Amino acid sequence: MALVRERRQLNLRLPLPPISDRRFSTSSSSATTTTVAGCNGISACDLEKLNVLGCGNGGIVYKVRHKTTSEIYALKTVNGDMDPIFTRQLMREMEILRRTDSPYVVKCHGIFEKPVVGEVSILMEYMDGGTLESLRGGVTEQKLAGFAKQILKGLSYLHALKIVHRDIKPANLLLNSKNEVKIADFGVSKILVRSLDSCNSYVGTCAYMSPERFDSESSGGSSDIYAGDIWSFGLMMLELLVGHFPLLPPGQRPDWATLMCAVCFGEPPRAPEGCSEEFRSFVECCLRKDSSKRWTAPQLLAHPFLREDL
């Protein structure tokens, strides 16, 4: 088994800290800021930092306000002295955000760079509801169907652009007060140049990796390149409903060996008996171990579980 023969370091993500009310003073910087990409004439000097929304992976996400329009945004700032891996992830995320324009993908309003200090900032729409991570166990099937439809439309859009997300999980799905859900965090995503490109590398969050991404040789290296996103999506849907990570008993903390065995050798998790037949079937279509039999995003959008939510 590929992953057993060559154990890779897991890409673990730290949870974002609680939203802070700490205010920032607005001081001018001696380093010149260059607008790499933007819209609506927004520049970095137009923005006032309000508080920290979160930090991790070498960067800080601020809640900011436009000084003239009072519009609220999220500003992700990364310093130039970060690890080269994070630098590549940032470049990849910037490239994908430049290419995408969908109501189901977080919108980029501008990219600013301070060449002298090597600082890069990405201005994105502000999602005031946080992430889906906070909703685990408190989501009804009806509400889950509404979320699923939006996420699948986002995945269908990305896959049509030959973009594989590779880290679909509750923490990377943003929510606003209108119950709109948008896909975010493209640091480990991949743009496929050729149809035969492989994307089964060990990146992202291992808990949500599909069987073929743990062991690419199990499918002879010919697995559906987009199917890993669907597996992650299916696990996430089940997790939001039952309130805990579905591959392990409630309260058990996952480790590499346990996860690998559960994903590669265990049976896929199923929805509880009390769930509707439509939802149970929906989850089963997402969590088929054979990636060639796993449903695609467009196919899942036509599933009876979502047709009930018109």
UniProtKB/Swiss-Prot annotation:
Upregulating conditions: Up-regulated during leaf senescence. By Alternaria brassicae pathogen infection.
Highest taxon above the source species: Eukaryota
Pfam family, one: Pkinase
GO cellular component: cytoplasm; nucleus
GO biological process assignments: camalexin biosynthetic process; cellular response to hypoxia; ethylene biosynthetic process; ethylene-activated signaling pathway; leaf senescence; pollen-pistil interaction; positive regulation of DNA-templated transcription; protein autophosphorylation
Record domain Protein kinase: where: 47-306
Enzyme Commission number(s) of this protein: 2.7.12.2
The reaction(s) this protein catalyses: L-seryl-[protein] + ATP = O-phospho-L-seryl-[protein] + ADP + H(+); L-threonyl-[protein] + ATP = O-phospho-L-threonyl-[protein] + ADP + H(+); L-tyrosyl-[protein] + ATP = O-phospho-L-tyrosyl-[protein] + ADP + H(+)
Uppermost EC category: transferase
Subcellular location, principal: cytoplasm
SUPFAM superfamilies in the record: Protein kinase-like (PK-like)
Chain positions found as Phosphoserine: S195, S201
PTM description: Phosphorylation at Ser-195 and Ser-201 by MAP kinase kinase kinases positively regulates kinase activity. Autophosphorylated.
Transmembrane segments: none
Modification Phosphothreonine, positions: T205
Binding site for ATP: L53, G54, C55, G56, N57, G58, G59, I60, V61, K76
Effect of T205D: Constitutively active
Variant or mutagenesis effect after changing S201E: Constitutively active
Disruption phenotype: Broad spectrum of moderate ethylene-insensitive phenotypes. Reduced salt sensitivity. Delayed senescence phenotype.
GO molecular function: ATP binding; MAP kinase kinase activity; protein kinase activator activity; protein serine kinase activity; protein serine/threonine kinase activity; protein tyrosine kinase activity
Active-site annotation: D167
Compartment list: Cytoplasm; Nucleus
InterPro entries found in the cross-reference section: Kinase-like_dom_sf, Prot_kinase_dom, Protein_kinase_ATP_BS, Ser/Thr_kinase_AS
PANTHER family: DUAL SPECIFICITY MITOGEN-ACTIVATED PROTEIN KINASE KINASE 5, DUAL SPECIFICITY MITOGEN-ACTIVATED PROTEIN KINASE KINASE 5-RELATED
Family: Belongs to the protein kinase superfamily. STE Ser/Thr protein kinase family. MAP kinase kinase subfamily.
Entry protein name: Mitogen-activated protein kinase kinase 9
Native organism: Arabidopsis thaliana (Mouse-ear cress)
Lineage per the UniProt record: Eukaryota, Viridiplantae, Streptophyta, Embryophyta, Tracheophyta
The encoding gene: MKK9
